[in-house]
């Protein structure tokens, strides 16, 4: 992982502009988590690519080919079917200290495994695994967001200063940002972005069910159907992430371009 390059990146205004475009929806995400569980809210974040495709088509007049249309259809079909049949509910459990500890151990271990896998192999392989590690960190940050909204309802804003959950948002979010930056620099954005948009909702669903008591339909058949719809959604996201039109106009791509420019400047100096 490139700590020295991060220092160069942080001094460039273009990088901060790209970062702000990625974080602009933070407040809306908190508001959504205040109203719904992780298994409902986090999968909706994949609609970023769908709306990007629609904006490119109807606002900027960019022609969308079969790849973009096919990816949008698959993603919408998988996401809509999952939300319709998975019977989300619950999510009212307040995690205890043991629950948080087990979640942190599991997610840190999973992220560490992803990082270790990212240290070797081809550039797409490394980029994908760094992206998966970043997605896990962002899912953990969302879990801390959800818990923080519960704390505010119970004790008001001052209670945030006396609990660890708000600080967990910052720690997990910064870790995710650092890992995502390494993912963008390690290889093609098609690999890193696919990992980010697929692993984040999947990790969030697992955390929501295991930590907050979110409900999915019971039974092997129902769970298999849930898995099939998520697989369909993931396939659509992979198709969209390999679209030159989508990738070259995404906020992540702007971050990559700024970072690569900084890397060249750092090497030249």
Language-model features, listed with the residues they occupy:
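Polytopic alpha-helical membrane proteins, predominantly small-molecule transporters/carriers
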Residues: 1-269
């Amino acid at each position: 992982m490139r700590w020295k390059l991060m220092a160069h990146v942080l001094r460039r205004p273009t990088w901060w502009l790209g970062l702000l475009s990625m974080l602009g929806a933070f407040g809306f995400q908190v508001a959504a988590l205040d109203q719904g569980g992780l298994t409902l809210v986090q999968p909706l974040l994949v609609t970023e690519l769908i709306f990007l495709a629609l904006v490119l088509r109807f606002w900027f007049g960019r022609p969308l080919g079969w790849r973009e249309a096919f990816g949008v259809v698959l993603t919408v079909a998988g996401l809509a079917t999952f939300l319709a049949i998975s019977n989300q509910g619950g999510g009212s459990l307040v995690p205890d200290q043991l629950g948080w500890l087990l979640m942190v151990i599991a997610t840190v271990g999973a992220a560490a495994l992803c990082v270790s896998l990212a240290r070797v192999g081809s550039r797409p392989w490394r980029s994908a695994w760094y992206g998966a590690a970043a997605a896990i960190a962002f899912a953990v940050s969302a879990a801390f967001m959800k818990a923080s909204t519960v704390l505010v309802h119970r004790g008001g804003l001052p209670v945030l200063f006396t609990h660890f959950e708000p600080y967990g948002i910052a720690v997990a979010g910064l870790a995710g940002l650092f890992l995502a930056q390494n993912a963008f620099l390690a290889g093609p954005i098609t690999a890193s972005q696919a990992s980010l948009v697929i692993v984040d909702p999947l990790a969030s669903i697992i955390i929501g069910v295991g930590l907050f008591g979110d409900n999915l339909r019971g039974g092997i058949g129902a769970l298999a159907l849930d898995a099939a719809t998520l697989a369909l959604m993931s396939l659509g996201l992979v198709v969209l992430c390999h679209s030159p039109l989508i990738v070259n106009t995404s906020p992540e791509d702007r971050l990559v371009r700024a970072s690569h420019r900084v890397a060249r400047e750092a090497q030249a100096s």
